[in-house]
C-alpha cells in the first residue's frame, strides 16, 4: 500500500489528504468496499504507538465522513497478523456497506 499511497500504483481513490488515502478494494466483499490507509507506513494495529496514533484517529475521521454516504450502516474491519487474515503488511481499515452484511464474520 505504500506504493499506492506514493502514486506509484494506480487505485480508484475516493478520498485523499496529506495523511490518509481511501480507495476502492479491487476484490470487494460488499457493494461498497473501501480501504482507508495512513499514507505513512504502519505495519498493523499491533504497531500503533503514541507517535502514530494521530494517523489512526485521522483514518477514523475519514471513515466517519465516508460513512455518511451509507445511512443504513457500515462495518469497519482491520485484520492484524496472518492468523487474522492480514495479507498486506500496511495498516488498513475495510469500510464495508451498501447493503445488508452477514452477521457472522467468518
Residue ranges with predicted function:
Residues 1-106:
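HIT superfamily nucleotide-processing domains
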Amino acid at each position: 500500500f505504500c506504493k499506492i499511497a506514493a502514486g506509484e500504483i494506480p487505485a480508484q481513490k475516493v478520498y485523499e489528504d496529506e495523511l490518509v488515502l481511501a480507495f476502492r478494494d479491487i476484490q470487494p466483499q460488499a457493494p461498497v468496499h473501501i480501504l482507508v490507509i495512513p499514507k505513512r507506513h504502519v505495519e498493523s494495529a499491533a504497531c500503533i504507538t503514541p507517535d502514530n496514533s494521530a494517523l489512526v484517529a485521522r483514518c477514523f475521521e475519514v471513515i466517519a465522513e465516508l460513512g455518511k454516504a451509507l445511512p443504513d450502516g457500515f462495518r469497519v474491519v482491520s485484520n492484524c497478523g496472518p492468523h487474522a487474515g492480514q495479507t498486506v503488511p500496511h495498516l488498513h481499515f475495510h469500510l464495508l456497506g451498501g447493503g445488508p452484511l452477514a452477521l457472522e464474520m467468518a
